[in-house]
Curated annotation (Swiss-Prot):
An example molecular function term from Gene Ontology annotations: tryptophan synthase activity
Pathway: Amino-acid biosynthesis; L-tryptophan biosynthesis; L-tryptophan from chorismate: step 5/5
Entry similarity comment: Belongs to the TrpA family.
Protein name as it appears in the record: Tryptophan synthase alpha chain
Function description: The alpha subunit is responsible for the aldol cleavage of indoleglycerol phosphate to indole and glyceraldehyde 3-phosphate.
Lineage, opening ranks: Bacteria, Bacillati, Bacillota, Bacilli, Bacillales
UniProt entry keywords in alphabetical sequence: Amino-acid biosynthesis, Aromatic amino acid biosynthesis, Lyase, Tryptophan biosynthesis
NCBIfam families, sorted: trpA
This protein's GO CC annotations: cytosol
């Protein structure tokens, strides 16, 4: 069964733009408003981060957003209960470290997710070899477990991951944490082009994407981008008009590969 998320992000004329927000940053009452705003801005899907006290993959902007959410007593269960009432039409993606999911209980987590518009799941600290901790519970659902692949992964590993990939492949474009960057590794284009050539699902570039130039660069070699730290920071600074204009422009970038 092809997942809803794959169909939504599959190659079209324009780059797929997925945005990241921290669930509960600014309070849970703002979550639906943020989601509807991003949907109206033309993004393809929205990633919702779950606040966690030890966020190993997050850069400083997202770490601060997580701390703000934790101060509001935001939890994974509270976010999912809020999302169950969401009117958003585009797919949502939960990005959570494994601990909050274990704490809630995997069966209960999957049960709650299925009552929401969430169609994808990213667990950055769950190694590919340990995915069977959660994949049995996802069998027969429309929830894709999205793999992250790094710049340093050998070709054999990339091929193994691509063969099993659902939703899309999250291609990490830097070695390190998330955050706004001005430049990328010189080998990134070849890495993404190779991934694209072997992947049965869309390939999206993430970590450090923060400008229209970045979106245009990656539109030459993959299917789209994930924009995180820039979105989190601009929402926090209440620069919604500027952010909306940026995202609309990003969503108009044409795929050139």
């Amino acid at each position: 069964m092809t997942k809803t998320l794959t169909n939504k992000l599959a190659k079209k004329d324009h780059a797929a733009v997925v945005t990241y927000i921290m669930g509960g940053d600014g309070g849970l009452d703002n979550l639906e408003e943020q989601l509807l705003f991003l949907e109206k801005s033309g993004v393809s899907a929205i990633e919702i981060g779950i606040p966690f006290s030890d966020p190993v993959a997050d850069g400083p902007i997202i770490q601060l957003a997580g701390l703000r959410a934790l101060k509001e007593q935001v939890s994974l269960e509270a976010i999912l209960n809020k999302l169950a009432r969401s009117k958003v039409q585009i797919p949502l993606i939960i990005m959570s470290y494994i601990n909050p999911i274990f704490h809630l209980g995997i069966p209960k987590f999957v049960e709650l997710v299925q009552k929401t518009p969430v169609k994808g799941l990213i667990i950055p600290d769950l190694p590919y070899e340990h995915q069977t901790l959660i994949t049995p519970e996802l069998q027969g659902t429309d929830i894709a477990l999205i793999p992250l692949v790094s710049l340093t992964s050998p070709k054999e590993r990339l091929e193994e991951i691509a063969k099993q990939a659902e939703g899309f492949i999250y291609a990490v474009t830097v070695n390190g944490t998330t955050g706004v960057r001005s430049e990328f590794d010189a080998h990134i284009d070849n890495h993404l082009a190779y991934l694209k050539s072997i992947s049965p699902v869309p390939v999206l570039a993430g970590f450090g994407v923060s400008s229209i130039e970045h979106v245009e660069k990656f539109a030459h070699v993959c299917d789209g981008v994930i924009i995180g730290s820039k979105v989190v920071q601009m929402l926090h600074e209440e620069k919604t008009a500027e952010l909306g204009a940026f995202l609309q422009k990003a969503a108009e970038v044409r795929i050139e590969n």
